Amino acid sequence: MCIRDSSNGKPHKLRLYSIASTRHGDNFEGNTVSLCVRQLQYEKDGQTINGVCSTYLCDIKPGDKVKITGPVGKEMLLPEDEDANIVMLATGTGIAPMRAYLRRMFEPSEREKNNWNFKGKAWLFMGAPKSANLLYEEDLQRYLANYPDNFKYTKAISREQQNAKGGRMYIQDRVTESANELFNLIEDEKTHIYLCGLKGMEPGIDEAMTKAAHEKGLDWSELRPQLRKAGRWHVETY
């Protein structure tokens, strides 16, 4: 998305956003696209600074015209194999591509339109500070109820839950808790792992994966490049 600077008429840097809908759109007619946007705000020199593009998107009104480009890249595409297992690790608005995946897998109207009929296991690890920050919760609970054999949903709510050491519960703590089951899936060549959210989540996930792999007698520093080379490790952080 390209926005022009009102002070000099020149365009700002292009902003990339993950698409939160399938190619059929939320209305299943193929003429809409959905985004998941949180307005960026930060303090600088005693002033509150608003992010340029996120503020623009949050302030536009129904009927306003917006020029966009894309889609860009193939990093986060789902595999063609209907029997693939999909492990998703997300924080905040990083839920966007995961929402698109889960709609494609489990939304009834979407399944009717797809030649691709998901039969594998989907496991979403979602990190948020509070329960109120969890997005698309109603849809996720519906998928859990309708597809209990195919969908698992694990939440890490840092300000409401505690980890095993009594500290705040983060997504990497949930990964460590689920080490055995998670790496049983990863050892299956049909399993793909998708990571999306703030770049700061990567070190914690790597540390958790290292511990989890060790419990299975595996070396994560060797395994991760192998997964990447095989096209099974997908990362989109910002």
Each language-model region and where it sits:
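Generic amphipathic alpha-helical segments used as scaffolds and interaction surfaces in large
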Residues: 6, 10, 89, 127, ...
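Ser/Thr-glycine-rich phosphate-binding loops at phosphate-binding pockets of nucleotides
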Residues: 90-96
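N-terminal start-of-chain detector that recognizes signal peptides
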Residues: 5-8, 59-61, 92, 164-168, ...
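FAD-binding FR-type
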Residues: 4-87, 103-113, 147, 158, ...
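Reductase modules of NAD(P)H-dependent flavoproteins
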Residues: 53, 64-75, 106-109, 113-238
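Phosphate-binding glycine-rich loops and their immediate beta-loop-alpha structural context
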Residues: 97, 102
